[in-house]
Amino acid sequence: MRILLPLALWLSSSCAFAACPPAGRDRASLQALKAAKFAMPDAIARNVLAEGLLDCLADPDPSLRDGIAYEAFGAWMRAGTFDADELRTLRDGLYARLDGDDPGGFRKPFAALVLSEVARTDRVAPWMRAGERAGMVERAATFLESVRDYRGYENGVGWRHGIAHGADWAMQLALNPALDRAQLERLLTAVASQAWPPTATPTCSAKANASRGRCCPWRSVA
């Protein structure tokens, strides 16, 4: 409970999202943490930082959004750092970031990407109740169906690619043996809705196509 308090207080406070880097941190300290593979023995300090890094998912600087925030969450979750209550708190904070306007187009796709890591933790070592898992399936499907910003890579700000990140989330859920047929079909329907979306714009710049040969980088499934 003591460890969860900083996150719980934040979730119950203002809906406005804070700036990035988080309070008490700067780019140099975050890069140093990355070099240390995001190791933080102090669970309270780690959870306070996790709270702040949620806001970095909306930052237009890819070195903060993708290189620090996403990588930190991925490292912590793949190492089994968070317990079930902490994962619930993180999940709910990410859900909040799927709501409302997203003028920059980064917050929602990167919240979905980190939610794919949350879904993976439940696939590897189940902790969600059936109702929670069903709720996440619906959240993921709704997110995928809602994407209308088809921008991919943009020089200076990096990747958005909401469809790819939503697909990562759907994939981790679909790989979970706890899902039933109806839930799998719900995800399939959501994916199919984007196979030929109502409106679309090019997702990659010419430079990105030339340098990478594809629109979206592959994310780890394991």
Annotate each language-model stretch with its function.
Residues 7, 30-31, 166:
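Solvent-exposed, charged interface segments at domain starts and junctions
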Residues 26-35:
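Eukaryotic acidic, Ser/Thr-rich intrinsically disordered low-complexity regions
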